């Protein structure tokens, strides 16, 4: 090393070349924050997601909501024209697989006994007239299970367009796609009163990218400023201020540049790397500079190049072991996160550890090289300044504390020691302190919530968060969860038994989980097809009511197409299981009573298809008959009772009236299950009926069935109005429990989609957190055991770190800060940095123990030598991370707060728990090999020179 330092320009040139090389790589770094990127690609959740997309299409959704602010309804000719233009232009985009909107979504209807598929506008018959607007609204009402709060909101003022994005598209491509979509929407809606909101995974990723760039441009200069101020206060010299800073800036460029070179994606958690390196990595340079000034102050005579080199080498020799040990332990703390299955945590751990290693390397090479180039005539000034350094800083700190009344004039330097004596100075006190930590931590940890929803990263007042909250409140929700129901053979999913169970599952989930906004599946289409195929035939030219009643019934608008599409029912008119009585019990039984199935099966025995009488013949006759006012009120009263009496809603009353006549086929909006209602002899033939429906259906079911004619697997789409992974987890568990109890044998259910991935990530965060903590604590134990040649050293050194982690989780629990992908790094930071304080104290205590057998004296001297340094370093690191409080992201603000707290607790515990245990247990590894030579006390109260 000495020979190398004689040629400092070799070191400086090499470092400069490497820095320029990595700096040039920074421009190619890719910023991305998609859920798919975070998950392990070999994990079950990720593999299932991709298999599902290969079969059913992409699950990357991008929503556009349009809200009218002046009209009573968004359904106007002008707005429909805007929606149609946006739809058509978006369909032309290469990365868009599908577009669903008010103008192109499928509408299933029956005409003259045939099954037809069209759109809500009516195809070529659409003219934009007021009558057309009414027909569109009536069609939306006609199929509530499909369109309610999807195509049109409850108040009629909001509609949405759903775009399906190609899952193979990169983050860069999605950013460009989003720009194109924004331009299309802006151009189409220009001059209208429509308020536009965009949401979905691509929008979230782009918003995170934008906010990250703002953070990096703001926070890095701030943390640099904090470090500069801290270093200048410490050294009062340019070398002492800028050399440690230079090493961490270069190490940051190397670390992030290497990420870009290796094509590692820069995520939100990676944005903490520069802050962490600048805040933590400067410690090594500070050690080098401090010992350099100390060695310089001890040098005698005229300074020469050779003597200056000896001073530098002396400083390196004195500090190299301590710096190396501190660096290794810090690296070990960060490396522990590599055990996580989550990709962003792995990359954060790897490149932060590399950055720390780079900072360590540069501290022992670049700083000495630059110091060696210092002109000899300026070294004297540095020497003079360094001789006054310790006393000046000490007096300033003491004067400040005395000024504010925090200490008396006699005890300023003993404050950390006095704090130790108060909390852990006796065996009783250290025991009570540990018990208090355990009890308080246990209470707080019980309150800790594990939730990995990425929406929580955004402030509530951010535009994206407001848009998502608006859609969750007014439409079906932005959180998409999917279930896959799989049989054993092709055609298994046409059997009435499983279709009935799937329908029951949907109703059960909706009732038990109010956060669900909508469930759509294969059964939704089967029920609709069954309905339109059983609409009673009407005589268009027959007067339905007596002349005396014409005026009364004219006020009831049944539409202009003989009742084929319209009814005067409201939102729940066409739900076959909507009455309150159906949901008396929140358990499974109210949705799938086995007795109901048995009764239905028993009633099917002996049933003959030849003896079947089509009830629609009677329904058609009733619908074509004249009705008196008295008969109408009898019908109304009957419907009122059937709908629940005093608890009845208008919607349910109308529904019961419609069912009495099978109006618009409403009595057949069901899974064909009851054999007596159909011209079949067995339930197996009902399966054939479903297959015939699929054959007749001219639309596509690719999103919901793997095979349109004989499906083996179907997909259920669940839209959730809440982003919490706790809600998602409950829905998934409810579905699995229901399926286990009520699905026929041979059928399975699995969850997938982005919501399921976030839920799975929550479990991974917990397991990776426990693994990384165990790994890092083990590393601490091994390092300390080897360093002090005793396993007791490992145990004692690990205890304050364990307590620090427990207190961190306690604070998170009480402060309602969720444990998620980002906050899971705190424990590793606590161990990686906190171990430095432990080692520093143990090393000094052991050195003092070799000089004295009086434990109080040893402890007090240890505090005098190491206490202030530990506190200062903790303060510097805490302030460095505290700049995260100015982040655009809520979660990074939490990280800033937590790291600051962790620095306080880890340093405090190192200065209380460790000396308390050492003085109570008196472990043998602290005993000196040679009996210490006692000192004589000087009159000034300072220890005499060591002998």
List the model feature ranges, each with a label.
Residues 1-33, 368-369, 373, 377-454, ...:
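Signature of alpha-helical transmembrane segments and their immediate interfacial
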Residues 26-74, 80-81, 128-151, 166, ...:
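Solvent-exposed, non-transmembrane loop/terminal regulatory segments of multi-pass membrane proteins
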Residues 405, 412, 418-422, 426-561, ...:
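Juxtamembrane segments of multi-pass membrane proteins
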Residues 47, 54, 92, 97-237, 249, 679-780, ...:
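Extracytoplasmic
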Residues 216, 245, 284, 297-340, ...:
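Pore- and gate-forming transmembrane helices of large, multi-pass membrane proteins
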Residues 13, 278-292, 320-339, 344-401, ...:
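Transmembrane alpha-helices and their membrane-interface boundaries in multi-pass membrane transporters
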Residues 5-6, 213-266, 339-343, 771-817, ...:
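Interfacial segments of transmembrane alpha-helices in multi-pass membrane proteins
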């Amino acid at each position: 090393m000495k020979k190398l330092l004689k040629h400092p320009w070799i070191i400086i040139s090499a470092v400069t070349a490497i820095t320029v090389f990595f700096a040039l790589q920074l421009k190619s770094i890719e910023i991305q924050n998609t859920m798919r990127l975070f998950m392990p690609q070999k994990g079950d959740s990720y593999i299932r997601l991709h298999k599902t997309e290969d079969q059913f299409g992409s699950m990357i959704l991008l929503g556009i909501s349009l809200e009218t602010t002046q009209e009573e309804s968004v359904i106007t000719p002008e707005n429909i024209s805007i929606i149609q233009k946006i739809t058509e232009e978006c369909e032309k985009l290469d990365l868009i697989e599908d577009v669903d909107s008010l103008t192109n979504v499928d509408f299933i209807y029956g005409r003259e006994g045939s099954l037809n598929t069209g759109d809500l506008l009516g195809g070529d018959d659409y003219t934009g007239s007021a009558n057309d607007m009414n027909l569109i609204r009536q069609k939306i009402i006609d199929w509530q299970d499909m369109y309610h709060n999807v195509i049109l909101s409850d108040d009629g003022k909001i509609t949405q367009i759903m775009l399906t994005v190609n899952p193979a598209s990169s983050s860069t491509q999605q950013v460009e796609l989003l720009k194109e979509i924004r331009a299309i929407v802006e151009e189409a809606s220009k001059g209208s009163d429509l308020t536009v909101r965009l949401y979905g995974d691509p929008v979230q990723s782009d918003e995170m990218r934008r906010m990250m760039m703002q953070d990096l441009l703001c926070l890095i200069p701030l943390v640099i400023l904090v470090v500069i101020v801290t270093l200048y206060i410490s050294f009062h010299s340019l070398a002492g201020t800028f050399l440690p800073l230079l090493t961490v800036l270069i190490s940051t460029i190397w670390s992030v540049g290497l990420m870009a070179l290796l094509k590692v994606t820069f995520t939100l958690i990676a944005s903490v790397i520069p802050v962490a390196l600048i805040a933590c990595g400067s410690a090594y340079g500070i050690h080098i500079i401090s010992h350099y000034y100390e060695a310089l102050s001890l040098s005698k005579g005229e300074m020469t190049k050779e003597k200056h080199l000896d001073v530098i080498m002396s400083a390196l020799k004195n500090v190299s072991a301590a710096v190396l040990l501190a660096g290794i332990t810090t690296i070990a703390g960060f490396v522990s996160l590599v055990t996580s299955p989550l990709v962003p945590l792995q990359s954060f751990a790897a490149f932060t550890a590399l950055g720390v290693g780079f900072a360590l390397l540069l501290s022992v090479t670049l700083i000495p090289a630059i110091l060696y180039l210092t002109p000899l005539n300026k070294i004297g000034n540095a020497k003079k300044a360094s001789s006054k350094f310790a006393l000046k800083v000490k007096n300033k700190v003491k004067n400040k504390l005395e000024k504010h009344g925090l200490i008396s004039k006699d005890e300023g330097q003993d404050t950390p020691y006095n704090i130790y004596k108060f909390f852990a100075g006796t065996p009783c006190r250290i025991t009570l302190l540990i018990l208090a930590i355990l009890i308080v931590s246990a209470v707080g940890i019980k309150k800790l919530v594990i939730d990995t929803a990425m929406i929580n990263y955004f402030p509530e007042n951010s535009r994206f968060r407001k848009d998502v909250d608006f859609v969750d409140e007014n439409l079906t929700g932005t959180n998409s969860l999917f279930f896959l129901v799989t049989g054993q053979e092709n055609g298994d999913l046409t059997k009435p038994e499983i279709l009935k169970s799937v329908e029951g599952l949907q109703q059960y989930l909706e009732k038990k989980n109010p956060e669900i906004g909508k469930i759509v599946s294969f059964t939704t289409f089967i029920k609709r097809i069954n309905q339109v195929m059983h609409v009673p035939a009407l005589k268009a030219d027959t007067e339905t009511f007596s002349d005396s009643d014409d005026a009364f019934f004219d006020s009831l608008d049944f539409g202009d197409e003989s009742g084929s599409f319209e009814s005067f029912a409201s939102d729940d008119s066409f739900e076959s299981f909507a009455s309150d009585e159906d949901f008396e019990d929140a358990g499974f039984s109210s949705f799938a009573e086995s007795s109901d199935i048995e009764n239905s099966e028993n009633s099917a025995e002996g049933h003959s298809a030849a003896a079947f009488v089509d009830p629609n013949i009677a329904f058609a006759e009733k619908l074509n008959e004249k009705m008196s006012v008295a008969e109408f009120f009898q019908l109304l009263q009957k419907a009122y009772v059937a709908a629940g009496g005093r608890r009845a809603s208008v919607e349910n009353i109308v529904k019961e009236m419609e069912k009495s006549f099978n109006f618009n086929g409403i009595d057949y909006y069901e899974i064909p299950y009851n054999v007596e209602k159909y011209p079949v002899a067995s339930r197996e033939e009902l399966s054939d009926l479903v297959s015939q429906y699929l054959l007749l259906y001219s639309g596509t079911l690719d999103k919901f069935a793997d095979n349109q004619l004989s499906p083996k697997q179907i997909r259920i789409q669940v839209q959730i109005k809440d982003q919490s992974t706790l809600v998602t987890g409950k829905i998934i568990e409810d579905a699995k429990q229901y399926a286990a109890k009520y699905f026929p044998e041979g059928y399975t259910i699995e969850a997938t989609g982005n919501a399921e991935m976030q839920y799975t990530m929550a479990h991974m965060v917990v397991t990776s957190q426990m693994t990384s903590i165990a790994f890092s604590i083990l590393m601490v134990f091994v390092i300390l055991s080897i360093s002090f040649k005793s396993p007791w050293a490992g145990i004692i050194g690990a205890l304050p770190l364990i307590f620090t982690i427990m207190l961190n989780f306690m604070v998170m629990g009480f402060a309602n800060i969720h444990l998620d992908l980002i906050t899971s790094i705190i424990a590793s930071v606590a161990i990686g940095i906190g171990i430095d304080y432990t080692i520093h104290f143990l090393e000094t205590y052991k050195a003092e123990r070799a000089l004295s057998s009086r434990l109080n004296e040893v402890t007090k001297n240890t505090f005098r030598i190491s206490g202030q340094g530990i506190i200062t370093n903790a303060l510097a690191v805490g302030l460095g991370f505290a700049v995260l409080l100015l982040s655009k992201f809520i979660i990074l603000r939490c990280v800033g707060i937590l790291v600051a707290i962790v620095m306080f607790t880890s340093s405090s515990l190192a200065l209380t728990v460790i000396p308390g245990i050492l003085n109570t247990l008196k472990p043998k590894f602290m005993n000196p090999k040679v009996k210490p030579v006692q000192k004589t006390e000087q009159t000034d109260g300072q220890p005499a020179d060591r002998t």
